Amino acid sequence: MGGLASELMDYGCEKVYIAEDPQLSLYQGDFYTDLLSKLIDENKPETILWGATIIGTEFSARVAAKLKTGLTAHCIDLYIADIKGKPRLAQVVPGWGGNIALIIICNANPQMATVKPGLMAKPPQRKVEGEIIPIAAEVIKNIIVGETKQSRAETIEIVEEEPEEMPLEEAEIVVAGGWGLNSLGG
C-alpha cells in the first residue's frame, strides 16, 4: 500500500488514508462503503472523483446514496466553475445519444463524479510531501464487526483470465464503421 500512497503524492495528494485489514483485501461493497462514508463524514471533502470501472461505478453509487449526495456518472470533462461566487465542480456528460453535452453542477457536498479510466491525460507530476494516515485498527474492526457481523457478499473463488485482445479503451487508435459500410471496401 505504501507504494500506491507514494505515487498519489507524486501527483499532488497531500493526505492519503490507508485502511489495512485482511477482511478488506478483496472488495466488499458494504464494508468499503461504511468505512469511506465514515472518513468523508469526518473530513468533509468538497469533491470526490472515482474511476468509472466496474467496482468504482458500484462503490461510488453506494457511497453517494449513503451520504445523500449527487453522483454524476461517466463524465467526459470536468472543470471548476464560479457559481454565485462559489467554486463548484462542473461535470460534463454526453446526453441525447451523444449529440449534445450536458453540464451538471451539484450544489451539495461532497460533489461526486465518475470518469472512465484513460479518458483524460495524466496531470504533470507535482510531488508533495504528503501525509500517510493509517486508519486505526479499532475503527476498521467496528465497521467490519458492526451490526451485520459479516459482509452480505462472500468471495468464493477468484478466476483470473488473460484477455484475448486488447481492451478497446486501451487502444491508441480505434477504427469503426456504421451501417453504411457494406463491405471492407466501403
Predicted regions mapped to residue ranges:
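N-terminal glycine-rich FAD/FM-binding segment characteristic of electron-transfer flavoproteins
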Residues: 1-186
